[in-house]
Amino acid sequence: MGRFIFVRFGLLVVFLSLSGTGADFDCPPDWSAYDQHCYKAFDEPKRSGDAEKFCTQQANGGHLVSIESVEEAEFVAQLISENIKTSADYVWIGLWNQRKAPYCVSKWTDGSSVIYKNVIERFIKNCFGLEKETNYRTWFNLSCGDDYPFVCKSPA
């Protein structure tokens, strides 16, 4: 009897510890969950604007991925490595340059603040992607008209 109570208590502790960690959110089929968001890497190359539009059509609140921490960056890099099979050198993310004289300000397409950066400081072009050569961990400034695979992110 004591062993049974101990096992039930242990299961209760595990259940309560998983509550709110992301283990209980519901992402669409073939999407991956991380920190209360759902992610999916798409292998079909698109221009940055077309990829953003596609992401908004895939899920409620969907956008090209915003990366807000080193942990999220690692998760996204792993997701890309496992799912993008094309030979493309870059993968689109949702960071873009908003040119408002006299400044150039970077913004995420989902409206979130840029609080984490891992970018090569070259702001000639308006869009950003993750570079394959850096294992998808460094952000590069790219021409928005180029076609690359991309990652979508939406609230869970």
Curated annotation (Swiss-Prot):
Glycosylation sites: N141
A GO CC term assigned to this protein in UniProt: extracellular region
Keyword terms, alphabetized: Disulfide bond, Glycoprotein, Hemostasis impairing toxin, Secreted, Signal, Toxin
Record's protein name: Snaclec A15
Localization in the cell: Secreted
Note: Shows greater sequence similarity to the alpha than beta subunits compared to other heterodimer snaclecs.
Domain of life, source organism: Eukaryota
Subunit comment: Heterodimer; disulfide-linked.
SMART domains: CLECT (SM00034)
GO molecular function, one term: toxin activity
Known role: Interferes with one step of hemostasis (modulation of platelet aggregation, or coagulation cascade, for example).
Protein family according to the UniProt entry: Belongs to the snaclec family.
Tissue/organ expression: Expressed by the venom gland.
Pfam family, one: Lectin_C
Signal peptide per UniProt: 1-23
Domain C-type lectin: 34-153
Organism listed in the record: Macrovipera lebetinus (Levantine viper)
InterPro entries in UniProt: C-type_lectin-like (IPR001304), C-type_lectin-like/link_sf (IPR016186), C-type_lectin/snaclec_domain (IPR050111), C-type_lectin_CS (IPR018378), CTDL_fold (IPR016187)
Disulfide bonds: C27-C38, C55-C152, C127-C144
SUPFAM superfamilies for this protein: C-type lectin-like
